[in-house]
Amino acid sequence: VFQRGSTMHSLVPRDENGRSNYRMGALRPNQFGIDDAHVVEYVESIAQASGEFLQIVNFNLAGQQYAVAGTVAGLKALEEDAAKRAAEHGGKRPFMYVPGIDVPFHSTVLRSGVADFRTNLDERIPAEIDPAKLVGRYIPNLVARPFELTREFAQSILDVVPSETVRVLLEVPGAWDAALANPGALTRTLLIELLCWQFASPVRWIETQRVLLSTEEAAPGVAGLGVDQVIEVGLGAAPTLANLASRTLLAPDFARSRVEVFNVQRDGSRVYATDVAVIEDEDEEEIAPATDP
């Protein structure tokens, strides 16, 4: 995490006072009538009209919460347009700046740092990784589908980022089959590509939650896992992911879901099953029926 953060910060130009030209804000498109299916198009239209960089970098809650990275001027244009639309629509404040953020995290602006971050990962990750630890258990936000050692999964990486490593695996004759002969090494290769490109790609949490919570197909070709419990490992005072899961489960798509949502610190007694009262055995003499004299 430290290496990733350091690399991200080093990629952003700063003036003599240490200030960058980037900020981040939270957008609530439901306040002005834009739904999840059209929010990307909306943000792109503001970027094009203003001539400034804007990108949704965190897809948090369908229709309701998106983090947008952009230039100072770009976010100003987005703020003004969203406010105008919300006023016309009768909605509440649709845009707020995220304080203290001046790096366009998870945006394409950082793609020039992917190679350096890959090198950092390569130096720190073991030569082989047991596939059983990741296959069907790890859902990378880069692709928002469970990890697999399949050509289809590798292609899903190439569908969103120009990974030369994955391109060679898929397009050079015999390369995929040769790599598959050593599953531990292939798992490592794909993991490194997923992590280094996630560094400069949006967090697709809406789709990831859909995979976790859906009992049917979560996306074309991607089966839902249908979990019955979500346990966030994080601060109980700020249960961000638990709150997002709870709000997601209120959507009509999950009306029939019966998923329990916990934060490990806030709901520790439930998570560790220590909230059940223990009934001690009573002495035999106390439970024996009374007898006639």
Annotated model-derived regions:
Residues 1-171, 176-179, 183:
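Alpha/beta catalytic cores of group-transfer enzymes, especially the acyltransferase/condensing modules
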Residues 104, 108, 112, 119-292:
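Acyltransferase/transacylase module recognition
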